[in-house]
Amino acid sequence: MEETDIAKLSEEEYNEEEDEDFDPTKGTAVAGAEVSDGEDDDEDDEDDSRVKDSYSHIVSESGGLVKTRRARQQEEEFKRKNKYEGIVEAAISEKVGSIWEDLKKESLSRLHNKENDSVISESSKLKKDNHVAGEEMVTIERVYKFAGETIREKKTVPISSAEAVEYLNNLKFRKSTDQAGSTKRKLEEIDVKENNNTNEDTSESGIDRKKLRRPLKRPPFLEQIISGALKPKLSTLEKSKLDWATYVDKEGINDELSAHNKDGYLAKQDFLNKVDSVKENEYKELRRKEMMIRLQETK
């Protein structure tokens, strides 16, 4: 009796709203657990399909789509192929038109100036030719061996040309060698005569002439070249020198080279040094005069 009374009293005194541990959804959650399992499987399949679709539209932190390498290549190729499709022809402004006209006028003026320059250069060439025609000419003849070949040259050039100067210098050198060779030959002839006289004397005295005969000398190399027995071989340095002289005459830059050569440069430097020394002397003289004036004022 007492237990039943306590249970009745507890049921009457119990209030669900005052009970903090009471959860009315517990009973329904257990009952609907089996039903919800099937629904969860369907939702998982839908989520997987959504994830697969979303990989093609990945959004970066800044909000734009993140493109794959293939997508970027396709986009660049598309832009390259269709880069001229979006160009719109617009009317040319007056400013651009005026600039274009100015450029055309400038190009025409340049062409006109070039024609004038060509006419002037032709006239200067004619003047040079006329000047050369009135000048004394020199005929240059050369026969030499170069690179195993015998080369023959014959040309007529003005006497003031670089090639003519080089040729005349070579002639002077050859003349000097000729004179040296002739003096050598004379000395050798005198020696031979003296030897003959001594041989005659020794023959009279009974000494064998063959033993006292001097052996014949080989003729000098320069004498062979002068006599024509040997053709002069031209070295690479001499050939380049001749080619340079020919080029100078062809281009007509002999006067320009003589004006800007080493001697001309040294002369200019000497002149500038003299000018500097004169200025320095004048400055020293002015300083001396100023010092004299100041000394007189202090006295």
From Swiss-Prot:
GO CC list: cytosol; Swr1 complex
Comp. bias regions, Basic and acidic residues: 1-11, 185-194
Keywords assigned by UniProt, alphabetized: Activator, Chromatin regulator, Nucleus, Transcription, Transcription regulation
Compartments reported by the entry: Nucleus
Chief location bin: nucleus
GO BP, one annotated term: chromatin remodeling
Keyword Cytoplasm applies: no
Region (Disordered): 1-71, 177-213
Family recorded in the similarity comment: Belongs to the SWC5 family.
Function as written in the Swiss-Prot or TrEMBL entry: Component of the SWR1 complex which mediates the ATP-dependent exchange of histone H2A for the H2A variant HZT1 leading to transcriptional regulation of selected genes by chromatin remodeling. Involved in chromosome stability.
Name assigned to this protein: SWR1-complex protein 5
